[in-house]
Design a protein with these regions (language model features):
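Conserved short beta-strand elements that form part of the metal-binding/catalytic scaffold
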Residues: 48-81, 91, 128-135, 208-241, ...
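Feature detects tandemly repeated or modular, low-complexity segments in exposed regions of proteins
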Residues: 18-21, 49-50, 66-69, 154-161, ...
Length: 327
């Protein structure tokens, strides 16, 4: 069956049209303790639990889905800035969120970059988040400058903590004014070679380069901003599934995108499915950051290999997805 699927994929690349992703489906993160994380993401982050199976949950937070699964490691390094995940937030809600984090003993660092107010904090596992407020925060002048704007260095290690969820549990069900995020802003990831990453994300992934300065670049892909830098950080572990970043792809673009990636020197998993309806595929960028393609309803998925956890025989070799890219 896989041979038939691969033969079909090989004939999918069009000379006139590059396949495209259609949006961001989800960001799935590793966690140390799933039950603790469920409390944090529901009560502190304001997420709505939308999916739960053994060992894995998903929360909807505004316009993004955050998945969580226990893993021995893989969260942002204790001294690192990358990867991190950012939400837009209004000025009023930024002040509320600062107080909210303090209320639940979550260390945080507010600062400013130009006219933008920001706050860094971590979840209990160590995944790093950023709040991004580019208008309406009245206290911005009192915030320290960003390090690259003349301010003090950020102590990312000090943002790590052992969380006591007792206060959050006690507040469940209470009528409290809660902060709200506006939308998902960006995912910023580590890369080993910035120039190579720019080529990969524009030429292969189809992103538009929208920011390129001081060792950091951003592309817009399917309406989502992805930043990358050589500053201290780490990609997805060689044998790990988390973190990974998933793009929606339309049915007509699924097989062409698989063929496009392979034609451009990207090692991919097999096209696979959990249920014969959804089409799935994993691949990495040249640094090793793990990405997923996700099509919710794909006719061709009937012929795809079924995952081992869903009663099939297909197991993803995550280490085998690492490769040397020559693009």
């Amino acid at each position: 069956m896989e041979t038939t699927v691969n033969s079909k994929i090989a004939n999918q690349v069009s000379a006139s049209r590059q396949p495209r992703f259609s949006g961001m489906s989800h960001v799935s993160l590793p966690c140390r303790d799933l039950e603790e994380s469920k409390i944090f993401y529901a009560h502190v982050m304001g997420g709505e639990l939308i999916h739960e199976i053994r060992g894995f949950v998903e929360f909807r937070i505004e316009d993004i889905i955050i998945g969580l699964s226990e893993q021995p490691e893989g969260w942002t390094g204790p001294d690192d800035e990358y990867p991190h995940y950012a939400f837009y937030i209004s000025g009023v809600n930024l002040e509320l969120m600062k107080n909210w984090l303090d209320r639940y003993a979550v260390p945080n660092y507010p600062y400013r970059r130009g006219d933008t107010a920001l706050i860094y904090f971590r979840d209990p596992s160590g995944n790093l988040f950023e709040l991004y407020c580019d208008t309406g925060y009245e206290g911005i002048k009192a915030l320290p400058l960003a390090p690259r704007r003349g301010g003090p260095p950020i102590d990312f290690r000090a943002l790590n903590y052992r969380w006591d969820s007792k206060a959050a549990v006690q507040d469940i069900g209470k009528s409290i004014l809660r902060p709200r995020f506006t939308a998902f802003a960006h995912a910023s990831i580590f890369c080993r070679n910035l120039e190579q990453a720019k080529r990969f994300f524009t030429r292969v992934i189809g992103g538009e380069l929208i920011h390129d300065v001081d060792g950091f670049a951003e592309v817009k892909v399917a309406g989502i901003i992805i930043g990358f830098t050589e500053r201290p950080g780490q990609p997805t572990g060689q044998n790990a599934e988390y973190p990974h970043y998933a793009f929606f792809v339309e049915p007509e673009d699924f097989l062409p995108m698989v063929a496009w990636l392979r034609q451009n020197g990207v090692t991919t998993s097999e096209a696979w499915t959990r249920d014969g309806i959804k089409g799935l595929l994993y691949f990495r960028d040249p640094t090793g950051n793990l990405f997923e393609m996700y099509c919710p309803k794909l006719k061709d998925a009937q012929s795809f290999a079924r995952g081992a956890k869903q009663g099939g025989s297909y197991t993803i070799d995550f280490a085998g997805l690492n490769y040397q890219w020559n693009g």
